[in-house]
Regions:
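Glycine-rich phosphate-binding loop used to anchor ATP phosphates in small-molecule kinases
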Residues: 49, 53-118
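P-loop (Walker A) phosphate-binding loop of NTP-binding proteins
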Residues: 8
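Conserved substrate/cofactor phosphate-moiety recognition/catalytic segment
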Residues: 22-60
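NTP-dependent small-molecule kinase module
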Residues: 134-204
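Hydrophobic anchor at the beta1->P-loop junction of P-loop NTPases
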Residues: 5
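A glycine- and Lys/Arg-enriched "phosphate-lid" helix/loop adjacent to the NTP-binding pocket
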Residues: 87-161
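Conserved lysine of the Walker
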Residues: 13
Length: 204
């Protein structure tokens, strides 16, 4: 089984992935952030490095999905391939930070990959307001994230909401991060687990 977490930068995907993997004894697959050779450069000069970064993420997540589907284990994935293609790359293109030529090349590659993969069995979307995202980003203190702009997070949030509203590829669970603290409050985590159980076992 393939469970995936989706959400904006700072929504709490990695934290919830860890907690759910521990609870269910699922195998976690994390976003390839530390190994990404383009991330620091991208936040310094988005226009120069946007295409390279997005191709790196696309390749990384495509390989990840193939690994997940060939695994006998239940896997929980931190961020999906769809977020790159539906949110981050189109946003960079709309902001003038990725050329139309590069964006069309990227979309063509994604569309080919998309014919070879399956959607997650359950997608968990972490919905968070911009103030919550900023607070979480500041708390974790990743140096390369210091230059992320408020308007950038806002644009990403708008694209996330549009994508989630039209998502029909599989089961979907929405978690309102503004209203809970699953990291520090066991009751909030328990509530999420109950909702996941209902989805997995078809008890709506």
């Amino acid at each position: 089984m393939h469970i995936a977490l989706a959400g904006n930068i700072g929504a709490g995907k990695t934290t919830l992935t860890e907690l759910l993997a521990k609870h269910y004894k699922w195998s976690p697959h994390y976003e390839d952030v530390d190994e990404n050779p383009y991330l620091n450069d991208f936040y310094e000069d988005m226009q120069r490095w946007s295409f390279n970064l997005q191709i790196y993420f696309l390749n990384s997540r495509f390989r990840q999905v193939l690994d997940i589907r060939s695994s006998a284990k239940t896997v929980i994935q931190d961020r999906t391939i769809y977020e790159d293609a539906e949110i981050f790359a189109p946003n960079l293109h709309a902001m003038g930070l990725m050329t139309t030529r590069d964006f069309n090349n990227y979309r063509s590659l994604f569309e080919m990959m998309n014919t070879l993969i399956q959607a997650p069995d359950l997608l968990i979307y972490l919905r968070a307001s911009v103030p919550t995202l900023v607070n979480q980003i500041q708390k974790r203190g990743r140096e390369y994230e210091n230059s992320i702009r408020i308007d950038y997070l806002k644009q990403l949030n708008e694209r996330y909401e549009a994508w989630i509203n039209r998502y029909k590829a599989g089961k979907l669970l929405i978690v309102d991060v503004d209203r809970m603290d699953f990291q520090n409050n066991p009751e909030d985590l328990s509530n999420i687990i109950d909702r996941i159980d209902a989805q997995i076992h078809g008890l709506f």
